[in-house]
Amino acid sequence: MRRIAVVGAAGRMGKNLIEAVQQTGGAAGLTAAVDRPDSTLVGADAGELAGLGRIGVPLSGDLGKVCEEFDVLIDFTHPSVTLKNIEQCRKARRAMVIGTTGFSADEKLLLAEAAKDIPIVFAANFSVGVNLCLKLLDTAARVLGDEVDIEIIEAHHRHKVDAPSGTALRMGEVVAQALGRDLQEVAVYGREGQTGARARETIGFATVRAGDVVGDHTVLFAAEGERVEITHKASSRMTFARGAVRAALWLEGKENGLYDMQDVLGLR
């Protein structure tokens, strides 16, 4: 049995992750659950927090105290928290699955450096469908080439704190790489006022934050007379949770290194 720990276990995604671990039919088991040290829920049973009934795993407020109790940590928190957790796992030689978004370029370099010592799966989105879309986007960009305008539209719930979403940025990276462009040079984030005519080489991003939208992403390839749209819509966070647990199981026996869901799904 793969021993899995979830950090941020008292949050919405954390509860979904706990449920997904418990749905593996014995292939994995939740052996540790961690949340903020100042959480009033520390000591509560993780299964009860997730609405699953008692499972005998108390919520801890200190990752360092439970590092011997798991093989892989699943982390969907905040960049500042994740970076601290990476150092803990690095010292304890524990694998990680990271779904945190909003990292800066420099922070991603720190993550890559840590992957020299432990195996890490890092992805902006753990949905199987989204990762299939990334493969389709690469093909579409190569076929349609420079003859289309490319726009990426994403929508999420009102509580999401980063924009554009990590998934939207990853989609932009895939398209830009397929076209031989540098996303940092061609990305346009929102438009306002007298913008002038659209430059063909740009990749536009539009962001919506409203209600309880779990996650919608559309990449638009617009030419004269026709357009192609590749869309993914998530209706439940369990989609991401199951993908993250799948990645945690896949990591067993893997060498140190930085992987993503394309590796996990055999799409690379």
From Swiss-Prot:
NAD(+) binds at G8, A9, A10, G11, R12, M13, D35, G99, T100, T101, A123, A124, N125, F126. PROSITE patterns: DAPB. GO terms for molecular function: 4-hydroxy-tetrahydrodipicolinate reductase; NAD binding; NADP binding; oxidoreductase activity, acting on CH or CH2 groups, NAD or NADP as acceptor. It catalyses: (S)-2,3,4,5-tetrahydrodipicolinate + NAD(+) + H2O = (2S,4S)-4-hydroxy-2,3,4,5-tetrahydrodipicolinate + NADH + H(+); (S)-2,3,4,5-tetrahydrodipicolinate + NADP(+) + H2O = (2S,4S)-4-hydroxy-2,3,4,5-tetrahydrodipicolinate + NADPH + H(+). It is an enzyme of class 1 (oxidoreductase). Its EC number is 1.17.1.8. The active site is at H156 (proton donor/acceptor), K160 (proton donor). (S)-2,3,4,5-tetrahydrodipicolinate binds at H157, G166, T167. Pathway: Amino-acid biosynthesis; L-lysine biosynthesis via DAP pathway; (S)-tetrahydrodipicolinate from L-aspartate: step 4/4. Signal peptide: none annotated. GO terms for biological process: diaminopimelate biosynthetic process; lysine biosynthetic process via diaminopimelate. NADP(+) binds at R36. It is found in: Cytoplasm. Keywords: Amino-acid biosynthesis, Cytoplasm, Diaminopimelate biosynthesis, Lysine biosynthesis, NAD, NADP, Oxidoreductase. Its main location: cytoplasm. One of its GO terms (cellular component) is cytosol. It comes from the Bacteria. It holds the Pfam family DapB_C. Belongs to the DapB family. Catalyzes the conversion of 4-hydroxy-tetrahydrodipicolinate (HTPA) to tetrahydrodipicolinate. This is 4-hydroxy-tetrahydrodipicolinate reductase. It comes from Pseudomonas aeruginosa (strain ATCC 15692 / DSM 22644 / CIP 104116 / JCM 14847 / LMG 12228 / 1C / PRS 101 / PAO1). The lineage of its organism: Bacteria, Pseudomonadati, Pseudomonadota, Gammaproteobacteria, Pseudomonadales.
